[in-house]
Amino acid sequence: MSELNKIALQILSNGKGILAADESTATMTKRLDSVKVHSDENNRLLFRQTLFSSSSMSECIGGVILYDETIRQRTSNGKTIPELINSSGSLVGIKVDTGAKILAGSKEEKITEGLDGLRERLNEYYELGARFTKWRGVYLISDKYPSKLSISSNAHALARYAALVQEAGMVPIIEPEVLMDGDHSAKDCLMKTSEVINKCYEAVSYTH
């Protein structure tokens, strides 16, 4: 556990933050299309290489979350992307969930998937240079959402993910995101977000 503490402290040292650069290929394609740049693997690499080569990286960024494609790429001079990020003093993270799908028993709410085969993927990501990970749970909010089913199912998935990540020697970022969409009040948002977070803490406590 001391090694995990060391990783967490290094990411947040001197008030630094985390750069989320884990856009999927589809999202990157939309961004490049908006500036009339063809989205192929090389152009996506050039974009990220330029971003991670900034002199400000060492001043502001303690960790960078990558997408599966990116952690496997090499720069024009032969460095791996993780090596480029490490050279600025930042640590490499990786998004490990595989996206949200409709939750069984619900017509609208979602469950984040990716637990199948996760232990093996984590071991590979560690060898590729990752030292922390991210998993995002998504919750709708309305007069009837998030339901007890959604809250408990996503909390359980987040807790299992976190336990596997720590087993692999990495720090898990747990991201329970209650979406802002809707006409609910700030009070309702606070109440339901608190319920989600409390359930996540409870689930994590059972696996550690």
Which residues does each PLM region occupy?
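Conserved, mostly hydrophobic/aromatic
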Residues: D40, W135, I174
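Alpha-helix N-cap and loop-to-helix initiation/capping positions
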Residues: S39, K110-G117, P146-A157, H184-V196
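Alpha-helical scaffolding segments of alpha/beta enzyme cores, especially the outer helices
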Residues: Q49, E120, E124, S153-E167, ...
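Hydrophobic residues within beta-strands of alpha/beta enzymes
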Residues: V64, T133, P172-I173
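Conserved small/polar residues in nucleotide/adenosyl-binding loops
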Residues: T207-H208
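Alpha/beta catalytic barrel-like cores
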Residues: M1-L128, I141
